[in-house]
Structures are given as structure tokens and as C-alpha cells.
């Protein structure tokens, strides 16, 4: 398997989904603006997403994929099918209970996660109503993530990577065509989320059948393999929960700030998630099953080379992305969001949060490479301990930054915490002698810094000659923005080429 081609396939699918996601957010911003209704929806949408990351894409994948890879390589197809059946049964049961409980307890959940909303009765009631509609998304997307994890282990990476596009299509369709028929209109977005979850699950099932892993969920509390996953999920849930608890606490802080703060942070987070999703999530998706196979077969040299390859790709693409995100924060927010009810003030507040987030972009992406280094070895406790330390320091930074920087201070805390998390993970990998960097890192980093400086100069020069970004229609603004971005990309890779960088060095292959 060519890892670079697999990464390109997953990244391209993820990029398409993120671009469509930006279109979705731009449409939502234009139709609904940034106020009480959107604050209510984003809280109601964020909570199922947080639980999805805990139960599905987070803890479950960390516990499930390494054991699934072991079954696939050592136990044979029949045993693997039985294993998948029992695991899917337990996951369905657990998530069904969580979903029903969440729908019944929606008002109390809001009281805990966004207590500032309780001061406004209408806002609190609307958020509770929206949460009851969006909660089934947890069950649907968790099952979709289970299917995706299996497909990834069979190297069918592009199929799960495309699935999130269906959620964006659902939300765009409901926002444009269904919102006028709902009262209040924001209810359309909540129903779009649930429909999107159904589409993501149904789309992947035929592909699961093609690889012979489409089985009916069954409950067996005594199956050794399924119980290993459950046992691993304990510390995994704790570790993932720590990072998600940090996001919930940030929402609690933001709920006490000016109206619109939750929305400003959401839109900034969406922009930051573009590079972190396209690269970080794609790398993590490919590396976890690949590292798991190397560990299961005892090939430590291959394991070490995979880690080094992933880290170099991180810095190659994340460093310029972080710098460009900060430089282009203004043009990005204005070009994508400043239309209709989304005012210039909203764009400015979103820009401030985006600049703060960009500080931690490298950390966010590097974590996606370093953490699988532990998960693939079925060591979940080490990342958990690091996550707890990171959570404590994040809240201390929140208290320090929220006064002078308001919502941007909360974003800055998340960014700095991501860098701290990455640093501690790297330290433990070296300390435990799990990973040893390959030769040539100093020269590699020096070349990157020089190329980023060249790119920064080109971007600043392009911004200087561009007209005011709030002028013109969306297509005109986006064309100008694309011209600036392409000029920056060309400058960066041209500088690397002059310095002797070769893309073929990253054409890693593994089995």
C-alpha cells in the first residue's frame, strides 16, 4: 500500500467535505446570523458531537482498531466476523441507552453544559428542544464510525472520508429549502443533523458488505475479544473525555460572555478544523491501522519509520498552514461569513478567535500522529495521564486569559494546550524508547522555516495590493482569496524546491 497515495485520497475527500462544510457554515451564517438561535443550535449540535468523539471516533477507535487489526492478521475471516458482530452489538446497546437518556434529560444537560443560557428562558427552552432532536445523531454516527473503522482496517480509506459530506449536504438542503417551514426556522438545522447521520450510516453499508464484514449486531458479554475492547475503552473514554470536557468547560465560560461568543468560537473553530482535519485526521486515519499491523507483526523498524514519516509530513504542511491561517484570518472570515445577518463586528470577533486558535494548529495535527503511536501498542493509559495534565493547565489558562481576551482567550487556551499535549506525548515516546527520529531533522526544519518566511512575505505583499475584503459578492471575494492562497502555496513549494526538497522522499510504502 502506498501511504502517500492513501493520504492524498483521504485528504482530498476530507478537503471536499470541509469545503462543503464551509459552504454550509456560510449559508447558515447568512440565513441565521450569529445570535440567540445559532448559539442554541451550536450548543445542541456540539453536545452530540462531543459524545460521538468519546464513544465512536475517539475511545472506540483507539480500543477497537488495534484489536481488529490483530484479529484480521492472526485469527482469520470467520473469527473476525464474529468479533465484529459482538462489538457492534455492545456499541449499539450502550449508545441506545445514552441517546434515550440524553433526550429525556435534555433540560438538565443544558443546565450543566451551558448554565449561562438559564438566564434567558427562551434561549434555554429552544436549546433543550434542539438537543432532543439532535441526540439520536449520537447513535447513528457512532454506528457509521464503527463501519468506517472496519473499512479503514481493510484499507478502504476514501469511503469513510467521504461520508461526512452527506451531513453537509443535508444541512445545506434543510437550511435553504426547509427552514421557512419550521417555527422557529433553526429547527430545520436540528432535523438536518439527524437525517445526515442516517445518510452517513446507510452510504457505507454496501461497502462493508463487499469486504464480507456486514454482520448483524449480537450481544455477548462473555466474548474474549469484545471484552478486550470494553476493557481498553475504560481508559480510552477517560482520555478522550478529558479533552472533550475541556471543550465543554470552554462552552460554559463562553455562555457567560457576550451574546454571539459561542457562535464566533464555532466559526473560528470550523476554519481551524480545515487544515487539522484535512491533514491531521487523514494521517491519524491511515497511521493507526498501519502502526497496529506493524506492532502486531513485531516489525519495530517499520513502526519507527511510519512514525517519522508521519511527523515530517505534519511539519511540512502544518507549519505553513498555521502561519497562513494567522495572516489570512481577516480575509478568511470576511470572505466566507460576512454576509446577510453576519455583521462586520461578528467577522472581527471570529477573526480574533481564529488567530488564537492558529497558535495551536501544529500541536493539534502532531497529536494525531503521536497518539496512534501509543494506541497501536494498546497503551491507552499514557495518553490519558497526559490528557489529564493538559486539562488542568487548560483551565488555569482559561482563568488567566478570559478577562483580557474574552472569547479569544478561550481559543488561545485550547491552542496552547494542544502544543503542550503534543510535547508531552513526544517526550514519553522518546522516554519509553518507542520512537527514535530518523537522521536529517535539523536540516529539514531549517528548510521549512526559510520556506515559510518566503511564503509569509508573498502573502503579506498580496494582501497589501488587494482591495477591501468586504467589497463585492461572495464569488468575487473567494476568487481573490484563492489567488492569494495559491500564490502563498506556490511560493512555499518553490522555496523548498530551491533548497533541494524532493516530494518523492515522502512516497512511503508499507504492507
Predicted regions and their residues:
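Membrane-embedded alpha-helical bundles of multi-pass transporters/translocases
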Residues: 1-511
Amino acid at each position: 500500500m502506498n501511504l502517500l497515495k492513501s493520504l492524498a485520497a483521504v485528504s482530498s475527500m476530507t478537503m471536499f467535505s470541509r469545503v462543503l462544510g464551509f459552504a454550509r457554515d456560510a449559508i447558515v451564517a447568512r440565513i441565521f446570523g450569529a445570535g440567540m438561535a445559532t448559539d442554541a443550535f451550536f450548543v445542541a449540535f456540539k453536545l452530540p458531537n462531543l459524545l460521538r468523539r468519546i464513544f465512536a471516533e475517539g475511545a472506540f477507535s483507539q480500543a477497537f482498531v488495534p484489536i481488529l487489526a490483530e484479529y484480521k492478521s492472526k485469527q482469520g475471516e470467520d473469527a473476525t466476523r464474529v468479533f465484529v458482530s459482538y462489538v457492534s452489538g455492545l456499541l449499539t446497546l450502550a449508545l441506545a441507552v445514552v441517546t434515550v437518556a440524553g433526550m429525556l434529560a435534555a433540560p438538565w444537560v443544558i443546565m450543566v453544559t451551558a448554565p449561562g443560557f438559564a438566564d434567558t428562558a427562551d434561549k434555554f427552552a429552544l436549546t433543550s428542544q434542539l438537543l432532543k432532536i439532535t441526540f439520536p445523531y449520537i447513535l447513528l454516527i457512532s454506528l457509521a464510525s464503527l463501519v468506517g473503522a472496519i473499512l479503514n482496517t481493510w484499507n478502504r480509506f476514501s469511503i469513510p472520508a467521504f461520508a461526512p459530506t452527506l451531513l453537509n449536504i443535508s444541512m445545506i438542503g434543510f437550511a435553504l429549502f426547509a427552514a421557512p417551514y419550521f417555527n422557529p426556522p433553526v429547527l430545520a438545522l436540528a432535523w438536518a443533523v439527524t437525517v445526515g447521520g442516517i445518510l452517513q450510516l446507510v452510504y457505507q453499508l454496501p461497502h462493508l458488505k463487499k469486504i464480507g464484514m456486514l454482520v448483524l449486531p449480537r450481544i455477548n458479554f462473555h466474548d474474549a475479544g469484545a471484552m478486550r475492547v470494553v476493557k481498553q475503552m475504560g481508559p480510552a473514554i477517560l482520555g478522550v473525555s478529558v479533552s472533550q470536557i475541556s471543550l465543554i468547560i470552554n462552552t460554559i465560560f463562553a455562555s457567560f460572555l457576550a451574546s454571539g461568543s459561542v457562535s464566533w468560537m464555532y466559526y473560528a473553530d470550523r476554519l481551524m478544523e480545515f487544515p487539522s482535519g484535512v491533514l491531521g485526521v487523514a494521517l491519524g486515519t491511515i497511521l493507526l491501522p498501519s502502526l497496529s499491523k506493524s506492532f502486531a507483526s513485531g516489525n519495530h523498524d517499520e513502526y519507527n519509520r511510519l512514525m517519522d514519516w508521519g511527523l515530517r509530513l505534519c511539519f511540512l504542511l502544518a507549519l505553513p498552514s498555521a502561519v497562513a491561517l494567522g495572516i489570512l484570518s481577516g480575509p478568511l472570515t470576511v470572505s466566507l461569513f460576512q454576509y446577510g445577518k453576519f455583521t462586520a463586528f461578528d467577522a472581527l470577533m471570529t477573526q480574533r478567535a481564529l488567530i488564537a486558535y492558529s497558535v495551536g494548529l501544529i500541536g493539534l495535527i502532531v497529536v494525531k500522529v503521536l497518539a496512534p503511536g501509543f494506541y497501536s501498542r494498546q497503551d491507552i493509559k499514557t495518553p490519558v495521564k497526559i490528557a489529564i495534565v493538559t486539562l488542568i493547565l487548560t483551565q488555569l489558562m482559561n482563568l488567566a486569559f478570559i478577562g483580557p481576551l474574552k472569547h479569544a482567550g478561550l481559543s488561545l487556551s485550547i491552542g496552547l494546550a494542544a502544543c503542550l499535549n503534543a510535547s508531552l506525548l513526544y517526550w514519553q515516546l522518546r522516554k519509553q524508547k518507542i520512537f527514535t527520529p530518523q537522521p536529517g531533522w535539523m536540516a529539514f526544519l531549517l528548510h521549512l522555516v526559510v520556506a515559510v518566511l518566503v511564503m509569509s512575505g508573498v502573502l503579506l505583499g498580496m494582501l497589501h495590493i488587494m482591495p477591501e475584503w468586504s467589497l463585492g459578492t461572495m464569488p468575487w471575494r473567494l476568487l481573490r482569496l484563492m489567488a492569494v492562497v495559491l500564490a502563498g502555496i506556490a511560493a512555499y513549494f518553490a522555496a523548498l524546491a530551491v533548497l533541494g526538497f524532493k516530494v518523492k522522499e515522502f512516497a512511503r510504502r508499507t504492507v
